[in-house]
UniProtKB/Swiss-Prot annotation:
Family matches, as SMART domains: Resolvase
Entry-linked PROSITE patterns: RECOMBINASES_1 (PS00397), RECOMBINASES_2 (PS00398), RECOMBINASES_3 (PS51736)
Name of the molecule in the record: Transposon gamma-delta resolvase
Top-level taxon: Bacteria
Stated role: This protein catalyzes the site-specific recombination of the transposon and also regulates its frequency of transposition.
Native source organism of the sequence: Escherichia coli (strain K12)
Active site: S10
Length: 183
């Protein structure tokens, strides 16, 4: 059994020092501590990727706190399952939680349920926000293409910018912009 450590900060203002010190105090050698800073996406987690390549069956990964392993609950659960499939257990120092043994399996099951509830809650909030925005007239999707020829034809026919903007459902300033660009 080899001990590895993983530390992650989600913003550039946070420091890895406290996490790294805790990992060393727990017995992890400095060359087996992997870190990631201010990672917004999973593709940016070089420390985690290196850790994935180094660990083998029977190894243990120490992490200072539960929330330091993944960016969100779903990400954390996916990582726990991935390491569990390799025969690698994870221990969270501050939380006193370990993924090995029957108790560990139960913890993972509970966390999976929490992750599912979190995904559902996010989906509900997203839909509520979208409906609220639509009620306020926010238009989703790509900006539609303006038919510049139609705007210019109407202008040449002597129609005013206000009439053109209402007919074409575009801003009056857009009408003037199209006219000025054509000159």
């Amino acid at each position: 059994m080899r001990l590895f450590g993983y530390a992650r900060v989600s913003t550039s203002q946070q420091s890895l020092d406290i996490q790294v010190r805790a990992l060393k105090d727990a017995g992890v050698k400095a060359n087996r501590i992997f870190t990631d800073k201010a990672s917004g996406s999973s593709s940016d987690r070089k420390g985690l990727d290196l850790l994935r390549m180094k660990v083998e069956e029977g190894d243990v990964i120490l992490v200072k706190k539960l929330d330091r392993l993944g960016r969100d609950t779903a990400d954390m659960i996916q990582l726990i399952k991935e390491f569990d499939a390799q025969g690698v257990s994870i221990r969270f120092i501050d939380d006193g939680i370990s993924t090995d043994g029957e108790m560990g399996k139960m913890v993972v099951t509970i966390l999976s349920a929490v992750a599912q509830a979190e995904r559902q809650r996010i989906l509900e909030r997203t839909n509520e926000g979208r409906q609220e925005a639509m009620a306020k007239g926010v238009v989703f999707g790509r900006k539609r293409k303006i038919d510049r020829d139609a705007v210019l034809n109407m202008w040449q026919q002597g129609l005013g910018a206000s009439h053109i903007s209402k007919t074409m459902n575009i801003a009056r300033s857009t009408v003037y912009k199209v006219i000025n660009e054509s000159n």
